[in-house]
Amino acid sequence: MGSFFAGIKAGTLAGILYVGGMAAFNVLLLYALKPEVLNVISTSYGSICGATAANSTANIESCFDSVVAVDVPYIAFVAFFVALIYAALFGRYYDSLPGNSRTLKAEAMAGLVGVNLVVFGFSGFYFNDTAALATGAFLVAWTIVFGYYLGRLYRKYTRVIEIKSQNPDLLRVLVDNSDLTGKARTFAATSNHKLRAKVSDDASFKGWAPNGGVTLEDPKSFETVMEINGDGSITGRVSKKS
């Protein structure tokens, strides 16, 4: 489990930072290496921007401006949605991801984002060795920053709840129809969830014992609604029938 919507919220803010930084770096790189960029444009798009085209100098400059004004935002747009998709998956499957460190989980997901951007050609501009080295180094460092903020923001928008049973053999705790007895799970802050006690035939349900940021609609009912306002725990109480 985990929170899909918390992942979306965290991914939106962290993603804006991520692609905004990438776009700014790409613009600076293009202007810093403008002579090389103009040479690549002239060579690769000679019929449109090269020396054989009418008013070639103006055309080359126009093509360069198009790279800055069109290609850079396009790359950022695609990169943002790639980051958002993976952030949503990060939130949805957060509790199922291996490891206990929130930061490492987020960094692993950020790494997948970076790899996908490289594989599909949306990580930046690699028109010569200098650009490739600079873009590669920046991408690695900036992806680590993205992972750090993704983890922090996900924690901000979620709460950790421990799901307990007084006697797991007699009572199982179901949250949104999933048996989470004895587990700690993340839920979106200020969210509501269906809580139900599955009691064995030889036991009697004795109510719920919420703690911390957990409140219940009816603590005495075996089936109720749990509201998450902070970290905490919920314990199902049970006794064996005499």
What are these regions (language model features)?
Residues K164-N167, V199-D201:
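Non-cytosolic beta-sheet module surface loops
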Residues T158-S165, P219-S242:
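Conserved "repeat-terminator" motif of extracellular CCP/Sushi domains
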Residues T158-V160, L170-R172, N192-K194, S204-G207, ...:
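Exposed beta-strand and adjacent loop surfaces of beta-rich binding modules
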Residues N192-P219:
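Surface-exposed interfaces of beta-sheet-rich extracellular modules
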Residues S178-K194, D218-M226:
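Short, solvent-exposed S/T- and G/P-enriched segments that are highly enriched in secreted/extracellular
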Residues M1-V160:
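Juxtamembrane/disordered regions of integral membrane proteins
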